[in-house]
A protein has these predicted regions:
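Bacterial N-terminal signal peptides that target proteins for export
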Residues: 1-8
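N-terminal accessory segment detector
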Residues: 21-144, 151-155, 159-178
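N-terminal signal peptide c-region/cleavage motif recognized by signal peptidases
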Residues: 16-18
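Hydrophobic helical h-region of N-terminal Sec-dependent signal peptides
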Residues: 9-13
Length: 178
């Protein structure tokens, strides 16, 4: 009996510590509070991830990046209705691309019937040193956006062209000749 009492006395502190440690695991842990800048960057990353995984999904089903861009254009072009001039389309694109931290745009040339502008490629860093993320290359990502914007421009009655000039996308939007 004396041995049992000694064992209880010896193990009681260990049992108490184990019980208290279990209670501590039930404490609520704080969740991270992101700054506005962190929220902005995270939101933009998620938009890019959705587009990238959409391209990947299309490819995994035997479709091309062009098919994906056309699908997105057909789906979303009606939301661009109300845009009447090339300048209006540029303004809409500018609003969308401002979502990307580090985005810059410069006007090159403008007239009543056409605009030419360029914007940088801040999304490029998402693709890392190998230029690919989630099975999609930066080239495919840009091709998908080019096809999408071409589809939207045609839907609105414009010609659209896009080319790379080092780290800039150079875009021209013109009224179609009637």
């Amino acid at each position: 009996m004396k041995k049992i009492k000694l064992m209880i006395i010896a193990f009681l502190p260990l049992l108490t510590t184990a019980v208290l440690a279990q209670d501590q695991n039930n404490e609520k842990k704080p969740l991270p509070e992101l700054t506005l800048e962190q929220k902005w960057q995270r939101s933009n990353w998620l938009v890019d991830v959705m587009m990238i995984t959409g391209i990947n999904q299309a490819k995994s089903h035997g479709n091309t990046v062009k098919n994906w861009g056309e699908f997105m254009g057909e789906l979303l072009a009606p939301g661009w209705e109300g845009i009447k001039t090339p300048w209006d389309m540029l303004r809409a694109m500018y609003r969308n691309y401002q979502l990307t931290p580090g985005f810059e745009m410069q006007m090159i040339k403008e007239s009543n019937d056409a605009v030419t502008f360029r914007f940088n490629r801040p999304y490029k860093s998402r693709f890392g040193d190998i230029g690919e993320v989630y099975g999609v290359s930066v080239k495919e990502y840009e091709k998908g956006l080019e096809v999408f914007h071409t589809y939207v421009a045609n839907h609105l009655g414009f010609n659209y062209s896009q080319r790379l000039d080092r780290d800039w996308n150079v875009i021209s939007i013109r009224n179609k000749k009637r």
